[in-house]
Amino acid sequence: MNLFDKIQAPKRLLRDLQSGDEVNWYYRIQEVTKKKTKNGDDFLDLTLMDRTGRMPAKIWNRASEFSRLLRAGEIYRISGEVKDYKGKRQMTVSHARAVGADDRDCDRADYEDTPSFDSAALLQRTFSLLADHLTRPALIQLVDLFKKEHGPSLQQAYGAQKIHHAFAGGLLQHTHSILQMVLAIAPHYGLDKELLLVGALFHDIGKTAEFKTQPALETTLAGGLLGHVVISLTMFLDLKNRIADFPEDLSTAIQHLIVAHHGEKEYGSPEVPKTPEAYLLHLLDLLDSRMDIFDEQRKNGDGKKLFSEFNQALGTRVLLAKE
């Protein structure tokens, strides 16, 4: 046993780490990629995770050695220092080793890729909301089938890999948020509330098949070749076709909401919004994703800088803290 192994350290969850902290604790490596610096030297680009969140990390020295040791999805005891990089916390890793039988202070429950909130309660509220506001028999049947087929996966799924709601249960939070906004805004413009509710439920459900989280978060074959918009459309058609005499006009309207929700073809929509309901769903989807990005920028700031670095998705820097 080397000196690194003998060091006794208190639990250091990622949420609590600040720039300047020296760390010797267990983390799950969610992603690991070997890259090169501008000078051509190898380094490892990592994403560390625990039940409180994620943090980017780098290994600058002995990258080739560690690239043979480290596997995405596994838990390691990691030594390093948290630093500020462009207004965000990032760990520079100096040592890492695999977890062994003697690591009794490693609680594997801290590294399960599961929602950090009561996702079962939120899932129940989501379907209760739909039940309270849907009156058309075809839509009620459709949502009942959805709940049985896709409810469990919706409860656990990531909303994205990196940009917004990029955590277990993120897709459920995103979906529920849009449903609530539909109820608030659709009546103001005299839009078809029930159509929008069902469109919101289905618009991103393909993400349950676009990503997998075990052993590590990555894109599936279907996700890479088809994308979540096409998968969502396929999942809707599968359920719709099980319902006798489902109105074709209603089916087409829902399909349009799914395929147009990214707004522009260059952003992944097969079609642009051509109905007010489709346009509103696009705007609500965009709004909720952007609000989550603001939230993440502020949560992941190092607590010292007033503004973040330029954020590509937002097209600006984010005010992190008041002076």
Where are these regions (language model features)?
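A short mid-domain helix/strand-loop element embedded in enzyme catalytic domains
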Residues: 138-181, 202-206
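Short, acidic/hydrophobic/Gly-rich beta-strand patch recurrent on exposed beta strands
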Residues: 45-50, 213
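Extended, charge-rich, solvent-exposed interface segments
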Residues: 90-158, 231
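N-terminal intrinsically disordered, cationic/polar leader segments
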Residues: 282, 304-317, 321-323
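OB-fold single-stranded nucleic acid-binding module
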Residues: 32-42, 53-109
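OB-fold nucleic-acid-binding modules
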Residues: 1-23
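Divalent metal-coordination and catalytic microenvironments
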Residues: 27, 73, 178, 285
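Divalent metal-dependent catalytic cores for phosphoryl transfer on phosphate-bearing substrates
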Residues: 163-164, 173, 183-300
